[in-house]
Amino acid sequence: MKNNWIDVLDESLVKDFYNNQTSEEQQEGLNTTLSFGTAGIRGKFGLGEGRLNKFTVSKVALGFAHYLTSSIAHPVVVIHYDTRHLSPEFAQIIANILASLDIKVYLADTYRTTPDLSFAVRYLQADAGVMITASHNPKDYNGIKVYGEDGAQLSTDDSARLSTYIDKLGHPLHINLPSLTTEQQSLIHSVPSEVREDYFKNVQDLVGTIPQSDLKVVFTSLHGTSVPVVPDILSSLNFNQFELVASQCEPDSDFSSVASANPEDHKAFDQSIELANLIDADLLIGTDPDADRLGIVERDAEGNIYYYNGNQIGALLLNYRIKQTEGLPNRIMFQSIVSGGLAKSLAQYHNVNFKEVLTGFKYIAAEIRHLSPEQNFIFGYEESYGFLARPFVRDKDAIQIVPLMIKYAAELKNEGRMLKDELEDITRNVGNFNDKLFSHTFEGTQGKAKIENIMTQFRSETPTEMCGLKVIAIEDFETGKKTDLQNDEVSDITLPKANVIKIYFNEGFIALRPSGTEPKIKLYVSLSCDHFDVIAQKINDAIFNS
């Protein structure tokens, strides 16, 4: 079978990537198979069923077409793509295959953000959407995310149904793809300009007027899709006191100026800090390549730098949304089960309804979809730097958050305060939670087995005490059971099943889960206790070095 793949190397679109891989990496592509999971498909470029190339993408596209036409008479699909290698090529392949089966397609004529895609599906009343992106993964990755008619990523059940349509097609080199006629070519349309115009109006309505202040902002797109949309939105709101990190705000599929195009990574802000020091800026904001997540850094008058983690940003944004929506009845917010305790405590402090969902923003979108008319969504977030303030988008949306955060900081600046001061006030009122994420990477087939072994061992040897902290409850989302060790009671977890274990102490919790999009296993620690860093490290060592 390797020879069959070598025969099509020139037309695979991934020749350069394949030739730069080690023999082990090349073999892994031939020995594995990409699967369409709950977060779509994400993988490296290369040859074989386990890699992204012209043929595996075509297989996904054809399976997706069959999935749509099995239940919809005249489907309409929106396709967007980011600034990664082969994103426009993959988008065009998918558009051509869908059109060849008489499916109407709106195809972006340049790179677009993930929030743009979610909004466009809703605005155009499409049946589905496709986003070509691998978020913040390294440059040799890409992916395909699929959205439903509500602008949210497919549910677990719909993802499984789509997966069966893809799998039944067999080997990607043996698939007979339908040809695209001239008439069918006319089914592929550009995305109308009024889609983005209406998106801008929604953001403007959310943010309102940004007050006059001395606030200066530095912004970086980390070579992704958020420029020019962010500068355009800020200008439309009459806020012009920002500077772009020029070296990082041009599309670059290699993400040349950063080791990781991930706003969670402090080093991703190094060039932003240099510019901030030069122009005496107060607030630094960066988005990931597809602009669904963002990070912030704050700089005081003496040039001191303050980094904020996803839970702290989430608490700040929730605090601001609570202020913005004061007097609104039946307010509700959502966060993922691995997000920290600060936002939950803040919601309870202000009598805002609160609910936890599984990791993955589609679960927050599902909760929004099922809200009653009397309930008012004000905020949703995940600790991995994904936030949503108003649900005209049904995925995390950094673009709507950027001007909202700037407005918040501008108001504080006029009071002689910083976000840091606001966060200190929050923790004084509701308690301080320290959060730390340990992320361990295990590549390849052996790495996947290693991750499975760690989860299996942790399940079988779940402790009653860790580093002096008494375990009071254990939630195993794979079995769907919660064990209360204080009352010796077992109850059902009402959320869908997932490969997550969460252990509670009086001081907070830890959670362990494999990543759904990367070859990683993640340990989340959220505790209100002394010597947090030491305890968190000991817990990590006990799990991964035992």
Swiss-Prot record:
Keywords, ordered alphabetically: Carbohydrate metabolism, Glucose metabolism, Isomerase, Magnesium, Metal-binding, Phosphoprotein
EC number: 5.4.2.2
A GO BP entry: purine ribonucleoside salvage
Family, similarity comment: Belongs to the phosphohexose mutase family.
Cysteine disulfide links: none
Name of the protein this chain belongs to: Phosphoglucomutase
Function, in words: Catalyzes the interconversion between glucose-6-phosphate and alpha-glucose-1-phosphate. This is the first step in the biosynthesis of diglucosyl-diacylglycerol (Glc2-DAG), i.e. a glycolipid found in the membrane, which is also used as a membrane anchor for lipoteichoic acid (LTA).
Catalysed conversion reaction: alpha-D-glucose 1-phosphate = alpha-D-glucose 6-phosphate
Class of this enzyme: isomerase
Cofactor(s) for this UniProt protein: Mg(2+)
Cofactor note: Binds 1 Mg(2+) ion per subunit.
Single annotated GO MF: phosphopentomutase activity
A Pfam entry, by short name: PGM_PMM_I
Coiled-coil region list: none
Record pathway: Glycolipid metabolism; diglucosyl-diacylglycerol biosynthesis
Active site: S135
Residues the entry annotates as binding Mg(2+): S135, D288, D290, D292
